[in-house]
Structures are given as C-alpha cells and as structure tokens.
C-alpha cells in the first residue's frame, strides 16, 4: 500500500477481517492511506458495488485461501475462494466502462508435479495433487476461459494477466505452518523446530521482489496489448 501511495495512487483494499492476534494489517494500519473494505470475495454483489463505485484503474487480485493444510480441512471453501472468487472478480471487471489493468496472482503450485530438475515453464501442464494446488490450477483455467470467451477481441477496456508466484519470505506472515516464521518463533523460545517436510527443497524470494514484479507487469500490460491474457512465472522454481 505504501509503495502504491508513493507512486501517487489512491488505494482501496477488499479483504476479510484480519486474523485474531498478531497480524500485519493491525500493526501497520495507522500508517496506511487506504480505503478499507471488509467482505468476502465469494459475494459477487459486494464486489460489484465496491468496485463499480471506486472505478479502479489497476487491480491486484491477491485474495486467496493460501494454506495447503487448510485446504485439506476445508476443500469446498478453498475452491470457492480461489476459483469462484476469481470468476466473480473477472465478471465484475468485465462490466467496467473505462480502461482497467488487472493482475491475478495465482501460484507456481498450479503446475502438474512431474518431478523435473528444471524450473517449470508457463507452457507446462497444469495440475495439482492437493486441494490448494488444484484450486490454483483451476483458477488459471477459469481465467483462460473467461479471457477467451469475454475479453479477447470483445472488451476494449479490460486487460488481464496472471502472475504465478513462488514461495516468498518477509515480515508480517503469522499464518500457521510457515517454515521461516515457524523457525523464528521456535528459536526465539529456544525450542526445536518441527519440519513438516524435511526431505523437500524449497526456493525462496523476498516478498518485495514479487510485489515489484507485479507492479512491473501491470505497467507492461498497460503499454503492450500483446501481453493481454498471458501468464507469467514470478518464481525461481
């Protein structure tokens, strides 16, 4: 938000209420210049009212159920949030009558795991063995179908792209089952770190690297029509 403010933007954010206890928004909200709207992305009428009223020039869609373990407990809610939420936002944005750039953040987990040593390419097959990964793959398919059906050569106002983000690390992540925050919490209490998948190797990027990439993608999408409807990896995986 601060980055966008420094660039001269008026910012509106739509989100569920923050998690109880420590959370990034609670700590920073006094210093944020933002119109704060509370609601569920699954509620298309709520989305439509706030977006139509605000008339955004640029939209970054980061709302998601983003925890793999939670997706096993609540698969229906995970799909509703990640897939239906994407469809709802696309539907609302397609009704705008002014130019709008929209970046949909999905995940590099959207690819079918084919156990290769190279990094995945945007043209690789989508898939997912767990509910979180498959919901993100499904969101990509919904995005692609909506673009082909209702935006490409049909909507002169809306340009869209997806950003497939990899693992990020940075301040303010209090979600459960986060490797780096869990290490910091355990070490601060002189406790042993519990690793859920000790045989896995995970690449990381700082959260500001990913965010700067999203800003750059929005800028390029605004200037280059040929990027409309494309997907881009933001990961070192």
Regions found by a protein language model. Name each.
Residues 122-124, 135-136, 160, 181, ...:
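C-terminal structured domain segments across diverse proteins
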Residues 1-165, 169:
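N-terminal Rossmann-like NAD(P)+-binding domain of SDR-like oxidoreductases, especially those catalyzing
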Residues 70, 93, 97, 150, ...:
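A general structural signal marking secondary-structure boundaries and capping sites
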